[in-house]
Every structure is written in structure tokens, then in C-alpha cells.
């Protein structure tokens, strides 16, 4: 992680950690950098960069700032307007853009925002290019073998254009519809759009596939994104599914790159369940290349043991769909993801895609002719407790001798019946304390003891 960009982009409270000037300068650098790359290869056409945004009030401000920077540096800015992160990746790859930018802070509250950078292949931007962006933000850029106090502006006809590209978003919707192998006619499907990016996309996809689609939290006002809604507040969808006799419910986050499910009984279906359900189906259909499912260190022990029982290999990466995708690409894997609902189907997408994930879960339900509850009940999840402690210094809090002592004590109590994972958040000032164990009471006790030690040592904010 860099000074500004974490595991999922440059994120912070709007006009505090992340300002309009930051966005303008990110645009200035990217417009110049891709133009310079072209010029050095004998191509004097303007770079083309596609931009999407979520429904936060500040997203419009950051969009204008990015466009100002891009066009001032000679790049053409193509605007998808309010759309999902995976749609930006899709359009960047399909339409040959130099890169893509998504303005979103994902599942964070409305007052936060972020800038996610996507390369021309629809993948998250490489760390070397991000390091150059950060160097320019800090005013000491070394690039192309030169030191730049400032990068040049475009002039006259070289100033970039701004292009309305809502058709790109529409092509993404059409692509999702084309992936539907089954009619959903007769199915009652509930969608929680988190008052975010999926509000005007997800229903269109399910309606086109014949579902009776019931939608909640699809009235964004700029201030209500993720507020008691979406994949991080799934209780409302659980109640809605049961009360409205739905077959299944799907909850997306603010930029719809993740999805969690609710079965017909109102039970939450996590990313681990989705990996198990889809992994088993893909093995049966011969689609699971390498016979491997890629998860992260946060995935439940129950998932790994269930996959092993099915004869499916598993791999663990660091937390972050970026790392999952990197492993999948290097090892030619087709399915990977996170417990939080970032699920990657690499045959169809280069990033986590919540709407695609919901379609794939429906595909398994239709193919197996089973309810989601029946499919999920074959996976036994170990009790898991997660406590997020907001801290002054993430690294120092983790390294504290007393905290390390508390971690070792918990590991001794658990033995081989559970595990402890303490890690820093990649996007927020948090230390995440996670404990799993067969015994739920012991799990909760160990987790609270570690979290309390962090607080007692004075690290908590």
C-alpha cells in the first residue's frame, strides 16, 4: 500500500483525506502519462479514459475534477455516469480504453469517497503506475528517465474532449443478460441495491430474464448510499425476503462489485457459501480449471474442509480481491473470492461483479433444481467472531508486545479447533480481530480478549 492508495484505491472522507484537488491532479497525471506513452511509441492520438461514479453527492464533484485534469493534459474523458465498478472494467477492456476510473468508496458511508484505477485490460492498476501517481501528487515525479517539476498542459486542438458514453453502460447490461442460461420466469427475486450504483442496472437484468423482481433501497439521494442497506446491512433484505415470500434475495454494495445472498428462509449466504456452491457446480460441469477455488485468509475453515471433502483444491491469498485475481491469473483459475462477497468468475469478468455473481448463483439453483437453502446447507460454517478496533496506528497496535501476548494466549486456548487472524484494514484506520472455533462461546471470548488488550494498551481512537 502507498501513501494515498490502499488495497482498493485512494479513499477517504470527501474534502478531508480526498479532495477535489487530489482528483484533478490524478486526472492531470493519467492524461499526460498515457499520452506520453503513446507519443514515445509514435502514436499522436489523444488517450481515451473512461469514468464511472456511484451515487454519492461528492461523486459529481470528483468527476468534474478528474475530467478537468484529464482534458487539461490532452486526454478524452468518456463518462458512463452512475454505474458499477465492474461495468467500468468491462467497458475499459471491451472498447480499448487506455485506462478506467471509478469514483466510489464501495461499502463506506456517503461522506467517504474514493478513486479506483483500472488498466486497459479491465484489471486493477499495477502498483508501479500507482507509485507514479503518488509521486506526482507529492510533487517529486521521476518518469521516463526524467525528473518533472510539473507536467505540461495540452494546448489548442490537443486539449481533450468530454464524451457522454452511457451506451457503454448499456452494453454492459446487455452482456450480463446474454450470460443468462435459464429463464427466471416464476421466480420471486429480491434485490437490495444499497441506494448505490446498481439501482438502475440490476433490476433491468433480472426483469429481462423473466424474474418477478422486487427491489429495495433503490432511491439514491446522494446521502443514503449503504445507509442501513446493501451487503453490509443485510438484515433488511432478510426480513423482506421472508415477508414477501421470495425465492432468494441478493444484496449489493455501493459500487456493486460484491454480492451477498439471502435464502428463502431468511438465512444470510456469505461469499464462502457462494464459493462452495459455485465451485461444486463448476467441478460437476467441468468448468473449474485447475480444480481449484481461490479464497483469502479470512475465509472460514469450514469452506476449506468442505472443498477438500469434494476433492477440490483451495488456495489462500491476502485479503483483497486484487490479490485473489492476481493468483487466479498466474495459476489459470476460474473461481475465487472473499467472504465479504467479492466473487470473481474469471471467464466472464476481470474483477468482482455483484450482479454477475447473483446470476451465477441463480444458474446453480436452476441447474440443480434446488433452493438456495438446500444448496448452502451442505457447508458447515465454523462460528466466527470479528471485531474491528479503530486505532491511531495500525502497525504499532498489531506489533504491541501485550497484544502479541494476547494473540498467543488465544491460539493456545484454541489449539487445533480454531484459529486467530489479526490484520490491519487496507482502507480504514482499523485493526480487524477475527477468531474462528468449533465452540462459539470460546470463539467470542478469545476475540474480545484480544480486542480489549488493544484498547487497554491505548491504541484505540
How would you describe each model-predicted region?
Residues 1-68, 72-73, 162-189, 395, ...:
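An N-terminal, well-structured beta->alpha segment
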Residues 5-6, 51, 77-82, 102-103, ...:
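General beta-strand structural signal in soluble alpha/beta enzymes
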Residues 13, 113-241:
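Gly/Ser/Thr-enriched, mixed-charge loops and adjacent short helices
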Residues 40, 48-112, 204-262:
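N-terminal small/polar loop signature for handling phosphorylated ligands or for N-terminal nucleophile
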Residues 52-54, 191-193, 263, 347, ...:
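Short glycine-centered, acidic/aromatic-flanked micro-motifs in structured strand/loop junctions
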Residues 131-173, 178, 264-337, 344-345:
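Proline/glycine-rich low-complexity loops and linkers
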Residues 248, 285-461:
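Phosphate-binding and adjacent anionic-ligand microenvironments
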Amino acid at each position: 500500500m502507498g501513501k494515498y492508495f490502499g488495497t482498493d484505491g485512494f479513499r477517504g472522507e470527501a474534502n478531508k483525506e480526498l479532495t477535489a484537488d487530489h482528483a484533478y491532479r490524478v486526472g492531470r497525471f493519467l492524461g499526460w502519462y498515457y499520452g506520453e506513452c503513446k507519443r514515445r511509441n509514435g502514436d499522436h492520438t489523444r488517450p481515451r479514459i473512461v469514468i464511472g461514479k456511484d451515487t454519492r453527492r461528492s461523486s459529481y464533484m470528483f468527476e468534474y475534477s478528474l475530467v478537468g485534469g484529464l482534458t487539461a493534459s490532452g486526454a478524452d474523458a468518456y463518462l458512463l455516469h452512475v454505474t458499477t465498478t465492474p461495468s467500468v472494467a468491462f467497458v475499459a477492456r471491451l472498447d480499448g480504453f487506455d485506462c478506467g476510473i471509478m469514483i466510489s468508496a464501495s461499502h463506506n458511508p456517503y461522506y467517504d469517497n474514493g478513486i479506483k484505477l483500472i488498466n486497459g485490460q479491465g484489471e486493477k492498476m499495477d502498483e508501479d503506475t500507482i507509485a507514479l501517481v503518488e509521486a506526482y501528487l507529492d510533487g517529486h515525479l521521476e518518469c521516463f528517465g526524467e525528473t518533472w517539476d510539473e507536467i505540461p498542459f495540452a494546448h489548442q486542438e490537443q486539449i481533450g474532449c468530454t464524451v457522454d458514453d452511457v451506451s457503454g453502460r448499456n452494453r454492459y447490461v446487455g452482456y450480463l443478460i446474454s450470460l443468462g442460461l435459464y429463464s427466471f420466469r416464476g421466480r420471486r427475486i429480491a434485490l437490495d441495491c444499497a441506494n448505490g450504483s446498481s439501482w438502475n442496472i440490476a433490476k433491468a437484468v433480472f426483469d429481462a430474464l423473466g424474474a418477478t423482481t422486487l427491489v429495495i433501497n433503490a432511491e439514491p439521494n446522494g446521502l443514503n448510499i449503504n445507509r442501513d442497506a446493501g451487503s453490509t446491512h443485510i438484515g433488511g433484505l432478510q426480513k423482506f425476503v421472508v415477508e414477501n415470500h421470495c425465492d432468494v434475495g441478493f444484496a449489493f454494495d455501493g459500487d456493486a462489485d460484491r454480492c451477498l445472498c439471502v435464502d428463502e428462509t431468511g438465512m444470510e449466504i456469505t461469499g464462502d457459501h457462494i464459493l462452495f456452491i459455485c465451485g461444486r457446480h463448476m467441478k460437476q460441469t467441468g468448468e473449474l480449471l485447475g480444480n481449484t477455488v481461490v479464497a483469502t485468509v479470512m475465509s472460514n475453515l469450514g469452506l476449506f474442509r468442505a472443498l477438500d471433502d469434494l476433492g477440490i483444491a483451495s488456495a489462500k491469498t491476502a485479503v483483497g480481491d486484487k490479490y485473489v485475481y492476481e493468483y487466479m491469473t498466474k495459476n489459470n483459475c476460474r473461481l475465487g473470492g472473499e467472504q465479504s462477497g467479492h466473487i470473481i468468475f474469471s471467464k466472464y469478468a476481470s474483477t468482482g461483479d455483484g450482479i454477475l455473481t447473483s446470476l451465477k448463483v441463480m444458474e446453480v439453483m436452476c441447474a440443480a433444481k434446488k433452493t438456495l437453502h438446500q444448496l448452502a446447507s451442505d457447508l458447515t460454517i465454523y462460528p466466527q467472531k470479528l471485531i474491528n478496533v479503530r486505532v491511531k496506528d495500525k502497525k504499532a497496535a498489531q506489533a504491541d508486545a501485550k497484544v502479541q501476548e494476547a494473540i498467543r494466549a488465544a491460539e493456545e486456548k484454541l489449539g487445533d479447533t480454531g484459529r486467530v487472524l489479526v490484520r490491519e484494514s487496507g482502507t480504514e484506520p482499523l485493526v480487524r480481530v477475527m477468531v474462528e472455533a468449533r465452540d462459539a462461546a470460546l470463539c467470542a471470548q478469545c476475540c474480545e480478549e484480544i480486542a480489549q488488550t488493544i484498547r487497554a494498551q491505548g491504541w484505540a481512537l
